[in-house]
């Protein structure tokens, strides 16, 4: 199992910068840029000499499931996949949001689950968990750090992409001036189907102890 750290170096009014680290060595960098009057952003990054981008898609969305805030995955100027938010609706009274990704003809899902003062994200490929994202709910000066635990090397890149999409749709606020601050997030999910996506023993069973 691999442990990857996404460490935010800076946050300006319309931009943010991250480093991707493994064993304290920088293996990639990411620059996120927003603009006035828009909640969307462009993500440009490098990972092991691979250049990639996430860009908001303006295409008309079709299909049986609703798609929100769709982004294209771009590598070497070619679109290789898409990431978007959608809703799972079990019945009239039971639903939850999650993130879906189609990449290189494979399907991935990210479930973000809140347990009060703890938020955990479980990433699945074909209904099998492949990685888990953990991070602090206490944020200083709007700088966010993420730790990704990844079972197999083949899923490192897609897990990183999903993490940056998560940051854009949840935490990135273009146009907001950065000040010295401490923010504590608190939220509690009650949907049993969503909560069931989290396995508290997954990291230890995969062979990596925190």
Go through each PLM region and give its residues.
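Intrinsically disordered, low-complexity proline/glycine-rich segments
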Residues: 1-210
């Amino acid at each position: 199992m691999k442990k990857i750290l996404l460490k935010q170096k800076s946050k300006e009014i319309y931009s943010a910068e991250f480093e991707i680290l493994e064993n304290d060595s920088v293996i990639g960098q990411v620059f996120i840029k927003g603009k006035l009057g828009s909640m969307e952003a462009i993500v440009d990054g490098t990972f092991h000499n691979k250049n990639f981008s996430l860009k908001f898609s303006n295409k008309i969305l079709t299909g049986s499931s609703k798609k929100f805030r769709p982004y294209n995955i771009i590598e070497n100027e070619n679109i290789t996949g898409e990431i978007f938010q959608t809703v799972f609706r079990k019945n009239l009274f039971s639903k939850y949001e999650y993130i879906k990704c189609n990449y290189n003809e494979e399907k991935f899902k990210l479930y973000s689950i809140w347990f009060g003062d703890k938020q955990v994200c479980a990433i699945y490929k074909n209904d099998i968990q492949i990685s888990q994202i953990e991070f602090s709910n206490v944020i200083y000066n709007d700088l966010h750090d993420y730790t990704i635990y990844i079972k197999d090397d083949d899923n490192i890149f897609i897990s990183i992409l999903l993490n940056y999409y998560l940051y854009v749709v949840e935490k990135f606020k273009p146009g907001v001036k950065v000040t010295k601050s401490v923010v504590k997030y608190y939220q509690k999910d009650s949907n049993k189907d969503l909560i069931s996506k989290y396995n508290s023993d997954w990291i230890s069973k995969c062979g990596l102890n925190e």
